[in-house]
Amino acid sequence: MTNIRKTHPLLKIINSSFVDLPAPSSLSSWWNFGSLLGVCLGVQILTGLFLAMHYTSDTATAFNSVTHICRDVNYGWLLRYLHANGASMFFICLYLHVGRGLYYGSYTYSETWNIGILLLFAVMATAFMGYVLPWGQMSFWGATVITNLLSAIPYIGTELVQWIWGGFSVDKATLTRFFAFHFLLPFIVAALVMVHLLFLHETGSNNPTGIPSDSDMIPFHPYYTIKDILGFLIMLTALSMLVLFSPDLLGDPDNYIPANPLNTPPHIKPEWYFLFAYAILRSIPNKLGGVLALVMSILILAIVPILHVSKQRSMMFRPLSQCLFWLLVAVLFTLTWIGGQPVEHPYIIIGQTASVLYFLIILIFMPTTSLMENYLLKW
């Protein structure tokens, strides 16, 4: 008798995606981050659902409702900090996942890559709106500054900002709609994840060598299921340590002060995972130019497949490109540091230099180096 997992209409879809899926035999731990992101999304949706049961999206009670969750709800503090630090873990996994795609040339699967970019934007939008909900000082002023950037759009900018705010400033209407969208978006993200996987399973996985692995495939289960479970344990241990020992390590102390439109914090900054983009935004003196640079810092990923001129897919055997890749990583760390610093000398010039380097490496240095490697290998 044929196994039910191969005949049942629903089970056979799961079977072909997670059990009998042919996978390259050489996948390293860098291929764990996709499944880790799935776990992060699950944790965020679950903790978020329970938090939403106690949260009130009204300017008068939002801050107090978060305090109530932490003090009065059973394990509310755990839910709140799992959700807040789970977002940080989500972005760590996201950036490592994107970095792996860049290093090993996974972007040549253009459909999967483009859905991934869409997912990145959706998760960033979700995280931004979530940061507004506790209604602390940084929530309020972060929302004001970031939404105000849209006023740089010619002709319709000011009206667009007021339409998003639902008034003439960030207020009750803004908080209510941000809560609605923050609740809705993760489910859209989950749907996009399905599309992401659908496109990935059309082509099969890439591997560290970048060479087609059709001749050497192994079943996903038990090999990669066990490997993924080990990844889950490591990540959840790290998250638990963060939540239980230093839950406020990555947060901003200003967010423990209730939102006050009459008092501006000395340094308005977003969560750490947006600091690199915030530094790029601040490094351009012109408002519209800064907004365009901000959007392009992420959207530039969409043109990476077009800029791939190397005869080799992966960077595994391309030492010059590897040097540039790690330089790009160093530039991103520098931008993240600068984004959290005040706008004064020498931080301004460091931020501007790092911003220019970021775009130069991706747009010019990497393609040029690839051509040079092709020439050196007589390809």
From Swiss-Prot:
The keyword GTP-binding does not apply. One of its GO terms (cellular component) is respiratory chain complex III. Heme b b566 binds at residues 97, 196. Its main location: mitochondrion. It is a multi-pass membrane protein. Heme b b562 binds at residues 83, 182. A ubiquinone binds at residue 201. Changing residue 198 to M: In strain: Isolate MVZ 185904. This is Cytochrome b. It comes from Pygoderma bilabiatum.
